[in-house]
Amino acid sequence: MSMTLHWSPRSPFVRKVMVFAHETGLAGRITTIRTVVAMTRPNHDLLAENPIGKIPTLRLEDGSVLYDSGVICEYLDTLHGGPRLIPAEGPARWVELRRHTLATGLLDILILWRNERDRAQPSQVLFEAFELKTRSALAALEHEIDRIPFGLAQITLGILGSYLDFRFADLDWRQGHPRLAAFHAKFEKRPSMQATQVVDA
């Protein structure tokens, strides 16, 4: 019996889980279900498993359910026999989780920004706030990238760069962030990234 993941080919959070699963050798134990979600159109089938109606949502082999990409990755990290991708304890754990939260928080901002762009009357004030926070987060990540080991935070950073290319090519995010750009150019060649490429469909 396999685990079942509510999945979309465009969600960076779903992709985080799938890249993590590939990197830990667990992708073959996950069956994906294409699940359409939108802020204005709740998915009632998904709500039956996740009361907030968000993806990724993972149904485990025993029928219980986990949601939030970070929580799901923490769970997957307990299932494989290789090196842990999230430190289990000590200062390294908190540094890893902080870096992961920074990258994930920027993804949250980008999704809100994209939704605002799609409104009939978008707010310029929000646009300016989103751009300021994006530039601030990218600067912080540029400062830290060379010290971030392979793990959950680095995976999330790889996905972040790809999502910026997919949805915000006009930001030219590589400009002024040469270390992030070099990291992403290398990271996106990993088999796990190639196996989970974004499909705009």
Regions found by a protein language model. Give the residues of each.
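Non-transmembrane alpha-helical segments in soluble domains
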Residues: 73, 77, 97-100, 138, ...
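Residue-level signal for nonpolar/aromatic packing positions in well-ordered secondary structure
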Residues: 58, 155, 187-190
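GST-like domain detector, emphasizing the conserved glutathione-binding G-site
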Residues: 1-125
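GST-like fold's C-terminal all-alpha helical module
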Residues: 103-185
